[in-house]
Amino acid sequence: VSNQVPGISEAEWEVMNVLWEKEPLTANEVIFSLQEKMDWKPKTIRTLLDRLVKKKVVGVNQNQKLYTFFPLYTQGECQKAEAQTFLKRIYGGTMKSMLVQFIEEEELTEEDMNELRSILNEKPKK
């Protein structure tokens, strides 16, 4: 598995969330789980699974009669990649400009500010 996590659409995130919760799963198990939350047709969910397999975000176990699907990346790896993409697109790739905007616009309590200071103080300098 390479370090570069492929981009995942919002709909594909829903499929991934099901697989991160419990894997491996058959296509029918993924469909059943998603139909409890989303108003999607089984064909739509199968298409999303196929896309995730093509992107190499989801693997397929073909050792059995039933194919089972499993994530090739952890939820944390995908969240980190998504956050970096967001930072590049919206904030020119710098964490500082995003943090400044959030800090200036948020109502922070003294406790919030102390916690942020503590996190920054514990962070090793580069």
Predicted regions and their residues:
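Glycine-centered, phosphate/nucleic-acid-interacting loop/turn motifs that mediate DNA/RNA or nucleotide
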Residues: K56
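Short, cationic-aromatic polyanion-contact patches
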Residues: V5-A11, N63-E82
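Amphipathic alpha-helical dimerization/coiled-coil segments
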Residues: K80-P124
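Alpha-helical DNA-recognition elements
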Residues: T47, R51
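Short helix-capping/hinge SLiMs at alpha-helix to coil transitions
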Residues: L19-P24, E36-K37
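Pre-recognition alpha-helix immediately N-terminal to the DNA-recognition helix
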Residues: E10-V18, E29
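Short acidic, hydrophobic short linear motifs in intrinsically disordered regions
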Residues: L25-S33
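Short helix-coil junctions and helix-kink-helix linkers
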Residues: F32-W40
